[in-house]
Amino acid sequence: MSTIVIAVIALAALAAVFGAILGFASIRFKVEADPIVDQIDAILPQTQCGQCGYPGCRPYAEAIANGDAINKCPPGGQATIEKLADLMGVEVQDSAHDLDNKVKMVAFIHEDMCIGCTKCIQACPVDAIVGGNKAVHTVIKNECTGCDLCVAPCPTDCIEMIPVQTTPESWKWQLNAIPVVNVTDSAPAAQKSAN
């Protein structure tokens, strides 16, 4: 037999042996994940922004499973808090970040100051910044979560957080500001005072 055929057979045999060892090890040493952590992680928005105080959504999901508050995720908003409360069987909590009264902010890059270093692109957890090396970068406003992680790495301080302009889509009615009077409760009192 030729040396090439012997080498191919030897490599194939080694690959089969090591593949079998890896297959056995993956079954034997498999670590079961907590299913509740997986369910919580599926509800979280996966922005990995760190606004909750944890380095990403998975560590925050593990903390929630261990009893931490469910109201620390600004990108998820009130809808995420309600889903987490339903899953965990706890009361719906108000947001820890006062999301209803907080103005949504997005990153804005002053393009005349941008040097194209890509540090902001690397820091953005949701890929809301586009641009290339040594080229001007810009922010996709609809994708930006306002996490503020892109501001610190910028060497020229050309990124600032600006409030999102109010549009018909982002308008929030303050329905609790309108007082509601129950007419049926006030009618007997008015009749008693007339008598």
UniProtKB/Swiss-Prot annotation:
InterPro entries: 4Fe-4S_dom (IPR007202), 4Fe4S_Fe-S-bd (IPR017896), 4Fe4S_Fe_S_CS (IPR017900), Elect_transpt_cplx_RnfB/RsxB (IPR010207), RnfB/RsxB_Proteobac (IPR016463), RnfB_subfamily (IPR050294). Residues 105-134, 135-164 form the 4Fe-4S ferredoxin-type domain. One of its GO terms (biological process) is electron transport chain. [4Fe-4S] cluster 3 binds at residues 124, 144, 147, 150. Its EC number is 7.-.-.-. Pfam families: Fer4_21 (PF14697), FeS (PF04060). Its main location: membrane. [4Fe-4S] cluster 2 binds at residues 114, 117, 120, 154. Binds 3 [4Fe-4S] clusters. One of its GO terms (molecular function) is electron transfer activity. Residues 25-195 are cytoplasmic. [4Fe-4S] cluster 1 binds at residues 49, 52, 57, 73. The chain crosses the membrane at residues 4-24. It is an enzyme of class 7 (translocase). GO terms for cellular component: plasma membrane. It is a single-pass membrane protein. PROSITE patterns: 4FE4S, 4FE4S_FER_1, 4FE4S_FER_2. Keywords: 4Fe-4S, Cell inner membrane, Cell membrane, Electron transport, Iron, Iron-sulfur, Membrane, Metal-binding, Repeat, Translocase, Transmembrane, Transmembrane helix, Transport. Part of a membrane-bound complex that couples electron transfer with translocation of ions across the membrane. NCBIfam families: PRK05113.1, rnfB. Belongs to the 4Fe4S bacterial-type ferredoxin family. RnfB subfamily. This is Ion-translocating oxidoreductase complex subunit B. It comes from Vibrio cholerae serotype O1 (strain ATCC 39541 / Classical Ogawa 395 / O395). The gene is rnfB.
